[in-house]
Each structure stands twice: as C-alpha cells, then as structure tokens.
Amino acid sequence: GDHVVSLFFPNWVKAECPQADFSYTPGDGIDGYATSYVVRPENWFTHAPKGWTHHEAATLPTAGLTAWRALVVEGKIKAGDDVLILGTGGVSIFALQFALKMGARVWATTSSNEKAKWLLEQGVAGVVNYREEENWGEKIFEMTGNRGVDHVVEIGGPGTLAQSIAASRIGGHITLIGVFTGISGDVPTAAIMAKQLTIKGVTVGNRSEQQDMIRALEVTDIHPMIDKVFPLEEIQAAFEYQRDGKHIGKICLDV
C-alpha cells in the first residue's frame, strides 16, 4: 500500500478550522496510532514524502506542520529575515531547518552549552543560554544589531513571551505554538503596542498545508532530526525522556 502520514485534525481540510478543541484528534479525543494496525477513512491521511522512513514521516503531522505553518503560512518568511527559535525540541528544529533553507538567518536559545555548540554547527547565527542569561530577549535584540528578529516561533507561553517580545523588531511576528511554562500569565501589552507586533496563536495545521509542506520536502534535502527511537513497550520511558528535556529534535516509537 501507500506510504502515508496521519493528520492532526482529520476533518480540517483547508481555510478556517472547524473546531476549537481536540475531540477528533487521534491520540487525544479519539484513539491514536500507537498500534500495529488501524482502520480510518482515507482522507485522514496524506502521502508521506517519497524516500522517507516511517520514523521520519511520523515527525510531520505535529512538529513539522506546526513549524511550517508558523513560518511559511502565517509568518510569510522570506530570504534575509531573522528568525528566533526557542530550544531544541521537534518544532524548533524543524523551524530551524525551514528557515535556513529559505535563506533566513536563525538565532536560538537553549538550556546548555553543549546544545548551543550543536546549534552553531547547524548554521545558527548566534545562541543564548537562557539559564545563564535571564534577559535573553534583550541579548538576542543586541546580537541582531539592535534591530530585532522578524519572526519568533514561541513555544513557552507566559514564561517566555515577554522575552520574545523584547527580541522582536518593530512590526515583527510572533507565532505562539506552545505553552510549556503555563496556560496563563501577565502579558506586556504596552510593549506589544509599542513594537506594533503581530502575535498569532497556531495549533498545527490543515490537510492542504500538510500537502504543501510535503511537496516542499520532496524537492529539498531536509530530513527530520530524530534524537532517539523507543520500542512501543517502552512508551512511558519515551515520555519521561521527553520530559527531562535532554533531546534534540524528535523522539519516536518503533511499532
């Protein structure tokens, strides 16, 4: 049969999302795909990129598509733009790869000097260790020549948003794709107004956007960064490994 990947929102084809919850999301509102076999409607899947392994393709429906939508669909990234990624998780690494391939300059934050070295080896222009630099947003702003970044792929939420705003240029674009630091908190509204920023909330993407991303991947040399693969029976250990934040890129299950 065909080599396929699932959709995060099976009933979201294009245009406006028909739902504001995860009631039809596999692995959330309905049973997911941590199984050997599954029966689902054909239109709940798209073709996987030609030549990709199953592990590689499995990284696309959530992390890959979120990064694609953040930068390409919503951010309308162009060559020469400055992009800030936070950390080295799956979405951030995909954002790094997409941004570099499109001719942008990438900046990053990370929690360790070891990860900082790895990021620089991938082509990142500059890295700030946020455990050593509390005001990392101001530091990134200075590193861009006091201009600020055009795009921030914001994964932290209330605990990092103020720093992402500080790192941004006037008229910049922040895509909020995660809330790792909490679901609510203070928002520096005056700073948003002063910098005339656009802040867009994004939850993955639709079928049409996933197909666009896959077409792009088939004509580039981008492949996902897979940190570690766990057998299905060690699924709990996989989640614990993710929780500890030691990974770079994606963690996969071998079914």
Describe each model-derived feature in a short phrase.
Residues 82-88, 100-163:
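Adenosine-nucleotide cofactor-binding segment
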